[in-house]
Amino acid sequence: LVKPPYSYIALITMAILQSPQKKLTLSGICEFISNRFPYYREKFPAWQNSIRHNLSLNDCFVKIPREPGNPGKGNYWTLDPQSEDMFDNGSFLRRRKRFKR
C-alpha cells in the first residue's frame, strides 16, 4: 500500500468538512481516515497519535466541548472559520499558508 500524498492537517480537514455538522471527535476523524485510505488501516495505532498532536498544535483546529446531554468520550474538533481557505481551490495537496489565530 502507498501512503496517500496528504498531510495530517489535510486529512483532518477532509474528515471535518465531510461531516454533517462540520465537527468530529478524534475517533470520528480517525475512523474517516481509515475508511477512506486503506494505508492507514494497516498502521492504525501509530498514526492516531499524530492526528491528536496535529489537532492540539495547529490553530486552524478548534476544540468544542460536548454538550451536557451528549454523552460520550472526548471533545469535538472543528475548523476555525477563518482557516477554511487554507487549501487552494479545495485541493488538499498544498496548503496556501500556515494559519495563525
From Swiss-Prot:
Main location: nucleus
Location of the protein in the cell: Nucleus
Taxonomic superkingdom: Eukaryota
GO annotation (BP), single: trophectodermal cell differentiation
Pfam families tied to this protein: Forkhead
SUPFAM superfamilies per record: Winged helix' DNA-binding domain
Family matches, as CDD domains: FH_FOXD3
DNA-binding span(s): 3-97
One Gene Ontology cellular component annotation held by this UniProt entry: nucleus
UniProt GO MF annotations: DNA binding; DNA-binding transcription factor activity; DNA-binding transcription factor activity, RNA polymerase II-specific; DNA-binding transcription repressor activity, RNA polymerase II-specific; double-stranded DNA binding; RNA polymerase II cis-regulatory region sequence-specific DNA binding; RNA polymerase II transcription regulatory region sequence-specific DNA binding; sequence-specific double-stranded DNA binding
InterPro entries linked to this entry: FH_FOXD3 (IPR047392), Fork_head_dom (IPR001766), FOX_domain-containing (IPR050211), TF_fork_head_CS_1 (IPR018122), TF_fork_head_CS_2 (IPR030456), WH-like_DNA-bd_sf (IPR036388), WH_DNA-bd_sf (IPR036390)
Keywords: Activator, Developmental protein, DNA-binding, Nucleus, Repressor, Transcription, Transcription regulation
Free-text function comment from the UniProt entry: Binds to the consensus sequence 5'-A[AT]T[AG]TTTGTTT-3' and acts as a transcriptional repressor. Also acts as a transcriptional activator. Negatively regulates transcription of transcriptional repressor Rhit/Zfp13. Promotes development of neural crest cells from neural tube progenitors. Restricts neural progenitor cells to the neural crest lineage while suppressing interneuron differentiation. Required for maintenance of pluripotent cells in the pre-implantation and peri-implantation stages of embryogenesis.
Quaternary structure and partners: Interacts with POU5F1.
Protein name per UniProt: Forkhead box protein D3
Organism in which the protein naturally occurs: Rattus norvegicus
